[in-house]
Amino acid sequence: GLGDVYKRQAYNGRFADLASKSASIVTGVKDGKLVIEKINGKYFMYWGEKAVYAATSDNLIDWEPVLDENNELRKIAVPRAGYFDSRLTECGPPAIKTVNGIVLLYNGKNGDEMDWDPDFPEGAYCAGQFLFDANDPYKVLDRLDKPFFVPEAAFEKSGQYKDGTVF
């Protein structure tokens, strides 16, 4: 994720109360291995829980959050009412640049009866996918309407996340 220093000290603590524990740096596949790649001359990272945000870096150490025209964090994608990801969209493993675009896997959390997908339990975490434009990593080309991986086994529906999780 972005780390305590980034959130609490940078930007005068503007993002200190923003929940985020994971981030996905864009990679490519070279000789069967994931290798971090630049997009338009910068390293690019998707991050966030309540929305998918972005940050860029010249050196993989110092990250600049991508801001919108109001100087707020730019929301690249947000939860959707009525879908499995109606509560949050939490970035997962490294995003992968493919011939079709950038694939980002994420944990989608189902909301409650006010905004949920009734095909899944309230609060269930299911895995979703975004496809972003490889040259414009802010542009969503596609997004799954149904998760590709859902909690089914008993151990996925017990413990800390009794409603189910696959991350």
What are these regions (language model features)?
Residues 61, 67, 73, 83-106:
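Secondary-shell segments that build the walls of catalytic and ion/ligand-binding clefts
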Residues 2-6:
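Short, small-residue-biased leader/transition segments that mark boundaries at the very start
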Residues 19-22, 89-91, 125, 167:
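Beta-rich catalytic cores
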Residues 1, 22-28, 32-49, 53-55, ...:
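Hydrophobic core segments of beta-strands in well-ordered, beta-rich domains
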Residues 58-61, 135:
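Short loop/turn segments that connect beta-strands within beta-propeller blades
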Residues 10-14, 159:
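A short beta-strand motif characteristic of beta-propeller blades
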Residues 90-149:
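Loop/turn-rich, solvent-exposed surfaces of beta-rich toroidal or solenoidal domains
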Residues 74-88, 138-167:
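Conserved blade-ending motifs and adjacent loop-strand segments that build the rim/top face
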